[in-house]
Amino acid sequence: MKGKSIYKSLVGLMFFGALQAFTSCSDEPDAENYYTFTGEMVSDYLDNRPEQFSDFTKVLQRSGLYGMMATYGTYTCLAPTNEAMAQYLKERGFSSVEELTKEECDTLSWNHIIAETYFTTDLSDGKIPTANMNERFLTFSCDSDAVEGGNVMYYVNMASKLVVRDDSVENGVVHTLNRVIQPSSAYLPELLLEDKNISLFTSALTLTGLNDSLYEYIDNTYYCDPDSVNKGIPFHRTGAEYRMYYPANRMKRFTALVETNKVFAEAGIHNLDDLKAYAKDVYDKMYPEDAGLYDEDWTNRKNPLNRFIAYHLLPYYGAINDFTISESGIDYKTTCAMPNLIDCTDWYTTMMPGTVMKMSSPSEGLFINRKGVASRFSVRGTKVYTPTEMKTIHDQDLAEAGLPVDTLNQQALNGIYHYIDNVLTYNEETRDVVFNDRIRWNVVTMS
């Protein structure tokens, strides 16, 4: 009897609970169950500071991105101030945002929004890992500002200073800029020509005709089925289904590793004739079977100067933090089997036929064709300067040469270029000493 009594009580409780659950279902929850949202979205952050961002807010509204900035997600908003927008408009002969076309507002908006959240603590000197919504990568760099008492200042594309940074909002982060971001629309050869600090290199690039190879951007031979782009291809892993999406377009991009005029001068190379002689001395030794056969045929791939320039060019995009595993944000100790015995290294083909270059990243920075570990090297190699170092060198060298110091932009529409600290060649030491090594190739760089 006792068991039946307990059973009836349990059934009664279950029925009462079900009844309560049924009767409590309502379109309007009790007041104490309301969630009151108090945080700011990106859109709120901008709206609540009209004295700073009213012009940029108008641009976002006209482009249609304003609504996205009011939704949940993970965004980085690089917001130019009203003063920055006024300067941008003045440079184009406009007096207000209303004079911009819809297309111009689209481009402005896309250039300043990244669909991922990046605080300055997440970034290092080099490329911001995710492209902006205009599918352009931006450069992040830092420098000390004497006017600000030596405090570290952060820049996007070497020109737009983060005057306020790391303001967290519910759907990302906002950084305030003192200048509108203007990614270059120039192709890589055109951007190189703008830099007066590398005029000797660009003269040789033009003479060899290799500049013509750097104008490619979109591969018109590429085709991918729309379903593979939009719906993806299913695959299974660890019991779960995933989808792999193919790119709609295949883009062609390039990297140039460039000596400044000062680096050439320190090696005794002061003009184009000096550079021709230097290249001939190196490559006649490397290719004795071709010595003297193509000396005046500058566009021939076996010409010494042509070989010299081609070895400075890579047929893909490489920011300084792209080249080795340790530079890609992956933990150094987990990616190198014995980090005390080997630097993180990768190998890349160049645009000089039949050649590669070795990229290593000891703590001193990124080096080309280095032999050894950390400071224990037998061949130092050639250092690739960071964006911060590059801007400093650019400004100092132009000032020393009595030339106007203009704005530096290393990112072209279809590529990027870096300053290097020594004359780069594929010489006998590189072939016989540096490349006398076990080649460990990161398969990602082969795609």
What are the residue ranges of the model-derived segments?
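Mature, structured domains of secreted/extracytosolic soluble proteins
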Residues: 22-447
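Sec-dependent bacterial lipoprotein signal peptides
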Residues: 1-24
